[in-house]
């Protein structure tokens, strides 16, 4: 029998400095375009992203690795009543890692759309920020309920955030549709400080929604060009937007190991490769019970075979027990981090957190990210520090211990 030795002996401490956040617009910017879409709880931000330091006081007792994430992340709906009734029912996440220096006080910026009990009236884009992927800021941005909302017909969805490094601003892009007039669009708001946002502008629109709708856009900003991957008719397609003009539609090749059909995507560029994370269904009539798949490409158009990397737990009582949805990922310091969308058939929705050295060996933890965020962050990042030193997956057991002999 193998012996497991607990290797955690240090803790995590967070230090921050409160400063005044100056709001600087580029020259010749029309300031009247800016308005707060949500009353902010505080104007205090971290001067620098929080850095984790070692401490002898961490208690890793009971820490375990899991296949999925038993705890959701603490991503809230701006509507307090909906949040009280259906807590942390976030969906369709997107995460950006803006590096160790961060942007306006935070390293990680996350967008999502609340989906309380599957109610698309509240499926409006939200943004929060974090320095540890577990403890989040107040809501930085949210769109109100649409005045012309029609259930299943006219609604917002599918938010995506982009960092425009030429203008040093964060941009959120989301989908708006009106099925009754065959209309679909992508709207954009942007901010130079993360707190004050422009009024929505039309980024893309069409009155031929069936043929040209951009479902679940995955966007990379590259030297003045928006490179946009999206889903239409269960196919991944690609267009570019530059100097106010859209390129022609190009088809992407994305085969599946089980002939599944793509529904939603996220895409990153990593080490000169394009990597895609999808949720896909084997039955076009069922987009509730899906798995996650992953593939790579040299050119962003022809991908290798997409293989399954995560599935629901199969337990009806788990928040992610019956289906997975649009998920997002990033690669940082030799590690993948995945914020994944999940649901069960009782209409409980949420976003969980996974990590791994590769996309085929992902782990969750048994930490309670909602009710014990500070301690959970300490344990999570201390384990990550140790895990980076492991030479192979065989050195780690399901309980998060290093194998000794």
Question: Which residues fall in each region the model found?
Answer:
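Positively charged n-region of N-terminal signal peptides that target proteins for export
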Residues: 1-4
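Carbohydrate-active catalytic/glycan-binding domains of CAZyme proteins
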Residues: 26-405
């Amino acid at each position: 029998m193998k012996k497991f030795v607990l290797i955690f002996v240090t803790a995590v401490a967070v230090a921050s400095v409160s400063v005044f956040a100056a709001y600087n617009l580029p020259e010749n910017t029309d300031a009247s375009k800016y308005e707060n879409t949500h009353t902010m709880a505080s104007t205090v931000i971290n001067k620098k992203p929080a850095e984790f330091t070692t401490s002898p006081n961490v208690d890793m007792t009971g820490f375990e690795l899991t296949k999925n994430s038993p705890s959701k992340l603490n991503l809230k709906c701006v509507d307090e009543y909906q949040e009280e009734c259906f807590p942390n029912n976030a969906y369709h996440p997107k995460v950006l890692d803006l590096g160790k220096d961060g942007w306006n006080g935070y390293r990680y910026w996350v967008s999502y759309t609340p989906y309380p009990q599957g109610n698309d009236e509240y499926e409006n884009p939200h943004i929060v920020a974090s320095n540890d992927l577990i403890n989040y800021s107040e809501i930085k941005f949210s769109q109100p309920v649409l005045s012309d909302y029609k259930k299943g017909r006219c609604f917002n969805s599918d938010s995506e955030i982009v960092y425009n490094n030429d203008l040093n601003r964060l941009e959120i892009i989301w989908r708006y549709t009106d099925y009754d007039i065959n209309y679909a669009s992508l709207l954009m708001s942007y901010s130079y400080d993360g707190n004050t946002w422009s009024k929505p502008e039309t980024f893309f629109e069409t009155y031929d929604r069936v043929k040209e709708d951009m479902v679940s856009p995955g966007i990379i900003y590259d030297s003045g060009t928006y490179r946009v991957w999206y889903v239409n008719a269960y196919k991944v397609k690609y267009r570019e937007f530059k100097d106010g003009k859209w390129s022609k539609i190009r088809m992407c090749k994305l085969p599946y190991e089980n002939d599944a059909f793509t529904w939603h995507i996220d895409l990153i560029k990593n080490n000169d490769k394009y990597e895609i994370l999808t949720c896909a269904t084997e039955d076009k009539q069922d987009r509730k019970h899906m798995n996650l798949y992953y593939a790579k490409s040299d050119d962003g158009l022809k991908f290798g075979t997409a293989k399954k990397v995560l599935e629901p737990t199969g337990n009806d009582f788990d928040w992610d027990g019956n289906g997975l949805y649009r998920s997002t990922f990033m690669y940082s310091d030799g590690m993948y981090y995945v914020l994944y969308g999940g649901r069960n058939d009782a209409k409980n929705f949420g976003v969980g957190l996974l990590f791994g050295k590769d996309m085929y060996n992902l782990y969750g933890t048994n930490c309670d990210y909602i009710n014990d965020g500070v301690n959970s962050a300490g344990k999570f990042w201390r384990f990550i520090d140790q895990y980076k030193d492991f030479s192979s997956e065989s050195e780690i057991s399901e309980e998060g211990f290093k194998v000794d002999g």
